[in-house]
């Protein structure tokens, strides 16, 4: 008999070992910085402004503030009592400027309705209305230190010199066709400056109405202007985010103040001429050293554009803006106090 050998035992091939997993770096989750806390709700007061505060002026005696707003109203406030004295008047369109007359008993206010109105501070009674006629709205207004003349800048490009005693136009100076967005009067009352939304600056002789100089001062519009006490220098703020100090004797830029990240809309000089405050659409006001051009402090409203700035008699910085409030700020920077709140929305 044939003997068959047993079938061979099949050994399955050894499966290759799985490859080792690649080393994977463990990336920790990103650290997300917490959002800054939201600003506290704004206080309100029924008699406050109902829209942006676009102008502030401090009375010569330092006791009161006058404000102009796009809600058409002019309001007079008591600083010490922290309350409204009265709504001084209402324009037919946005109010733009409100200035105390040197006599201490009246004010001059102006707005987009084209009217310049002299009002009694004691009760708001209208003493005189200066109508700009076909010149359009009054964007900015300035008064000579002796109270004899007012200079108005208009949205149709003209600059008008008013004889306040006679209640009449002394000169109507033709600009360059662009809306006039800044005006200022020299301390001696003999010269005036106008700035336009194209960045052009013009120096005028008030008595004759003649143009003394014209130059392109900024790459964008000029929205704030102030003469220094010596009358030989001028500061201007602009939509190009800069502030410039001009030497009027040479016509050259003497210094530049930089730091804002939006249009510089308002300027004011301290009584001693050592400090400059600027308000900007970037939501900040900044305090500057006039001698060095260095920034001393920054005030951040966190509530939108700042349209108006002023110094009180003791040097406190005041601002007004998009949030309808009037605020005062510590000189070294930091948080503000709402001096006068806006009306409830």
Outline where the language-model segments fall.
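Intrinsically disordered, low-complexity, repeat-rich polar/charged segments
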Residues: 1-32
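WD40-repeat beta-propeller superdomains and closely related acidic/aromatic-rich repeat-like regions
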Residues: 21-345
């Amino acid at each position: 008999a044939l003997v068959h050998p047993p079938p061979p035992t099949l050994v399955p091939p050894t499966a290759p070992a799985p490859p080792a997993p690649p080393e994977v770096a463990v990336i920790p989750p990103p650290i997300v910085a917490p959002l800054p806390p939201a600003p506290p709700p704004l206080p309100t007061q029924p008699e406050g402004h109902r829209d942006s505060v676009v102008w502030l002026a401090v009375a010569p005696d330092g006791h009161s503030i006058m404000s102009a707003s796009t809600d058409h109203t002019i309001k007079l406030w008591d600083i010490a009592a922290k309350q409204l004295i009265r709504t001084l008047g209402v324009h037919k369109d946005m109010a733009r400027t409100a200035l105390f007359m040197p006599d201490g008993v009246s004010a001059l206010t102006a707005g987009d309705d084209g009217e310049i109105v002299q009002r009694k501070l004691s009760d708001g009674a209208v003493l005189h209305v200066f109508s700009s006629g076909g010149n359009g709205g009054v964007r900015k207004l300035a008064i000579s230190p002796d109270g004899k003349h007012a200079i108005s800048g208009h949205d149709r490009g003209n600059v008008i010199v008013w004889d306040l005693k006679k209640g009449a136009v002394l000169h109507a100076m033709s600009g360059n066709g662009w809306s006039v967005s800044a005006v200022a009067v020299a301390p001696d009352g003999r010269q005036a400056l106008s700035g336009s939304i194209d960045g052009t600056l013009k120096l005028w002789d008030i008595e004759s109405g003649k143009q003394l100089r014209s130059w392109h001062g900024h790459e964008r519009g000029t929205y704030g202007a102030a003469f220094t006490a010596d009358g030989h220098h001028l500061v201007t703020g602009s939509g190009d985010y800069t502030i410039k100090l001009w030497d009027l004797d040479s016509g050259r830029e003497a210094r530049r103040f930089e730091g804002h990240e939006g249009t510089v809309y308002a300027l004011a000089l301290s009584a001693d001429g050592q400090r400059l405050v600027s308000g900007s659409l970037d939501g900040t006001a900044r305090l500057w050293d006039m001698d060095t051009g260095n920034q001393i402090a920054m005030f951040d409203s966190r509530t939108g554009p700042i349209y108006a700035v002023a110094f009180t008699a003791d040097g406190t910085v005041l601002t007004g803006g998009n949030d309808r409030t009037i605020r005062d700020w510590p000189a070294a920077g930091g948080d503000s106090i709402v001096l006068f709140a806006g009306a409830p929305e």
